[in-house]
Regions:
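Active-site rim loops that border cofactor/substrate pockets in soluble metabolic enzymes
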Residues: 88-135
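Conserved active-site and cofactor/substrate-binding residues in soluble primary-metabolism enzymes
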Residues: 19, 35, 39, 69, ...
Length: 215
């Protein structure tokens, strides 16, 4: 796929569009990259459907990871180490568009079925079975809520580290601090948790280095 380009927040978006680019903050993604992704994914879907019409999102993501060879990919390493990836927003964005278009071209008895409930069972077991559980949450949104919401069923996480640039003043879940989670039983106590107001891709690698190497 085409590489992403470093752009700017302060650009003329009509000009960006005229150049067949799409802006994500200060990152530009070309139309060609989306076209290439759709073609690759459509071919992958055709092969996948030869084995099963039912998609369990975490299993599907693992199969994609097995097809990748790029060692910079999170999906590649997760599949290699058999680490499940759960995506509550699985049908959002381009991926959802691909599923819709793919199904529109197929007969009723050939259409894909996305079994999100099967993933809920797997995910909740991972949350409920350990004696203690903690979370490192990068950013926020639906992924953060999916995790801490599930923790309500065990009276909350034991520990949490939030790394986010979000703020809490508009009721934002992404910006909500650990102490708010205590009121929902999403977190047992804010004393064993911390919120770091920082950009996660800058801070998390530094923390990971310390955890791995001890300094």
């Amino acid at each position: 796929l085409s590489p992403f380009l470093l752009g700017s927040f302060d650009v003329d978006d009509n000009e960006v569009k005229a150049n067949k680019l799409n802006r994500i903050g200060n990152i530009f993604v070309s139309d060609e990259s989306y076209i290439a992704l759709e073609k690759w994914h459509n071919d992958f879907l055709k092969d996948f459907c030869l084995k099963s019409r039912t998609i369990v999102p975490s299993e599907y993501i693992a199969e994609i990871g097995k097809k990748l060879s790029d060692k910079r990919s999170v999906l590649y390493w997760a599949a290699k180490n058999e680490v499940p990836i759960f995506c509550p927003g699985f049908v959002d964005g381009a991926l959802g568009d691909h599923f819709f278009i793919f199904n529109e071209k197929r007969h009723a008895d050939e259409k894909l079925i996305i079994d999100a409930a099967a993933d809920l069972t797997k995910f909740y077991k991972l949350i409920l079975e350990p004696k203690r559980i903690g979370a490192v949450i990068l950013g926020g949104g639906i992924a953060k809520h999916h995790l801490i919401g599930a923790a309500i069923l065990r009276d909350g996480l034991d520990y949490a580290i939030y790394i986010s640039t979000g703020n809490e003043y508009d009721g934002s879940l992404s910006g909500a601090k650990p102490k708010e989670a205590v009121s929902w039983n999403k977190l047992k106590s804010s004393k064993n948790s911390v919120a770091i107001d920082a950009e996660a891709t800058l801070v998390f690698p530094l923390l990971a280095h310390v955890w791995i190497h001890g300094s």
